[in-house]
A protein has these predicted regions:
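Long, internal low-complexity/basic segments
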Residues: 359-372
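His/Asp/Glu-rich, glycine-adjacent segments
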Residues: 62-246, 349
Length: 372
């Protein structure tokens, strides 16, 4: 298998239940094309359903006991505090480390957790890059370690989108009856602005790099669907008992709008990389979207995970993948192994995932190594 470029795209919480409805309605044409000409399937998640742990398992092909990322926070024993999880706590090499070691150029955008950005042969923009820490775009700083290499920091800083920069034109596609919103200080409107600006910022950075840097693999992570679902899924049709009429009238289409926006970003990305690039689109888990939607959540830090479904998505599209097929029995551990296989590299025998042989157009030669 001749190595071709690869794009890996993560949509946190994306779910076929919603996607298939939108494809049928003609609202996600790019993903519809990928499904028609590629391979689709479910990805089983892991327990507990905590995104930093899950995306690290995706990036390493290993369970948390091997890679060391167990949740959103970790103890700092010397300082006697609990701190946000960081990339320095990962105990196993991720695919970007392996590919760099093997002479491949890799770009990684917003992977969770990837702060501080790691030195790789390419560009890494950490998961803190898009977060607006202060009101006002002019006062928006950027912490050291957000971008590697450091000399690109000012460039990437300049192409971010702050929530306060969004206009009615940007927000109206996500709203019904927007005239009923009483104030710009509406908390749900502010939440939507932040989620949308975050996604647009990651897209801005990744498309700049696709166009202006040399790369063999580009990995792009978006958490906007997950955040939109946590904020607005209860307001999606069909209307749940107890949902206020005024909120339903305004925000019932917000989740679907966020999916449509992701399809637009996907279309732009695929047009930039061309038909000879292998593309893998995944999510770490799904999200309850029907009568199973909980109206209340456990009062604990990980309580929102109760809204998740156990299966995420996978769609593989490109010259090395089958066409119009459905694959079965895959999990989020089964992403790094096929990435390595696409580049003709061996899979670590200490990896817990498999190389997704059923997804390939031609059965690849799978090599192994004791560990990376």
């Amino acid at each position: 298998m001749k190595a071709k470029k690869v794009v890996l795209i993560g949509w946190d919480a994306a779910d076929w239940k919603v996607i298939d409805q939108l494809i049928e309605q003609g609202h996600m044409p790019m993903l519809a094309e990928m499904v028609k000409k590629g391979v689709r399937g479910n990805l089983s998640t892991l327990e507990p359903v905590l995104s930093p742990m899950l995306w690290t398992s995706i990036a390493t092909g290993k369970y948390a006991d091997k890679h060391g990322i167990h949740g959103f926070t970790e103890p700092d024993y010397e300082a006697g505090i609990v701190r946000p999880i960081s990339s320095t706590s990962r105990k196993s090499r991720a695919f970007w480390n392996i590919l760099t070691n093997q002479g491949k150029k890799v770009n990684v955008f917003s992977w969770w957790p990837s702060n501080p950005a790691e030195p790789i042969d390419g560009i890494m923009v950490s998961n803190l890059y898009q977060r607006a820490s202060k009101p006002g775009a002019k006062n928006w700083g950027m912490n050291p370690g957000t971008v590697y290499p450091q000399e690109l920091s000012e460039l990437f800083k300049s192409i971010r989108i702050h929530p306060e920069e969004l206009t009615e034109e940007h927000l109206l596609p996500f709203l019904n009856n927007a005239h009923k919103i009483e104030s710009k200080e509406d908390k749900k409107l502010q939440a939507l602005s932040k989620i949308l600006a975050d996604a647009a910022t990651v897209h801005s950075a990744s498309t700049w790099a696709l166009e202006n840097s040399d790369w063999d693999l580009t990995a792009i992570y978006h958490d906007a669907i997950d955040h939109a679902c946590h904020a607005f899924m209860k307001l999606r049709a069909p209307k749940l008992p107890g949902v206020p009429d005024d909120l339903f009238e305004i925000y019932s289409d917000t989740v679907d709008g966020m999916y449509r926006f992701h399809d637009m970003m996907l279309e732009r990305t695929l047009k930039m990389v061309g038909p000879d690039t292998n593309v893998i689109l995944i999510s770490d888990h799904g999200f309850q979207s029907d009568h199973m939607r909980p109206l209340s959540l456990p009062k604990e830090p990980a309580g929102p995970a109760a809204e998740h479904r156990k299966h995420g998505i996978i769609c593989c599209y490109g010259p090395d993948f089958n066409e119009g097929q459905t694959i079965y029995g895959s999990s989020i551990l089964d992403i790094t192994p096929p990435l390595l296989t696409l580049f003709g590299l061996p899979i670590g025998e200490d990896m817990d995932g498999t190389p997704l042989i059923q997804a390939f157009r031609e059965t690849p030669t799978v090599k192994t190594i004791s560990s990376w």
